[in-house]
């Protein structure tokens, strides 16, 4: 006598047993990102702003010059978008460097949308 495998439900119309169990993984949320902004002032030389952009944000001269012009014309520019810790560090580095060179350059961060 041949034995049939034992099934959870031998009734084909019974949908209470869906068969496979799946484990749902919780979705990992990405950490919030922060924009680092440079603000225009009437005293910081344009070339100093270019140096800051090259030194602390790794931009080439042309990229740094473009952002410096945006800061000059529009009053501010987004320099980059980073994790909170990186943005905070960059703001502190720029502000410290500007102070040490006696420039009033302002750098801030805000949460990216």
Curated annotation (Swiss-Prot):
Biological process according to GO: protein catabolic process; proteolysis
Region Disordered, residue ranges: 1-26
Matches recorded under InterPro entries: ClpS, ClpS_core, Ribosomal_bL12_C/ClpS-like
The family this protein is said to belong to: Belongs to the ClpS family.
Role: Involved in the modulation of the specificity of the ClpAP-mediated ATP-dependent protein degradation.
Quaternary data: Binds to the N-terminal domain of the chaperone ClpA.
NCBIfam families in the record: PRK00033.1-2, PRK00033.1-5
Protein name: ATP-dependent Clp protease adapter protein ClpS
């Amino acid at each position: 006598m041949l034995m049939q495998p034992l099934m959870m439900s031998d009734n084909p119309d019974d949908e209470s047993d869906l068969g496979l169990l799946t484990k749902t993984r919780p979705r990992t949320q990405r950490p919030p990102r922060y924009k680092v902004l440079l603000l225009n002032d009437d005293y910081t030389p344009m070339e100093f702003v270019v140096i800051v952009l090259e030194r602390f944000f790794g931009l080439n001269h042309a990229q740094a010059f473009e952002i410096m012009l945006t800061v000059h014309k529009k009053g501010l520019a987004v320099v980059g978008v980073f994790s909170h810790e990186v943005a905070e560090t960059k703001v502190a580095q720029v502000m410290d460097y500007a102070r040490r060179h006696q420039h009033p350059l302002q750098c801030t961060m805000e949460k990216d949308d």
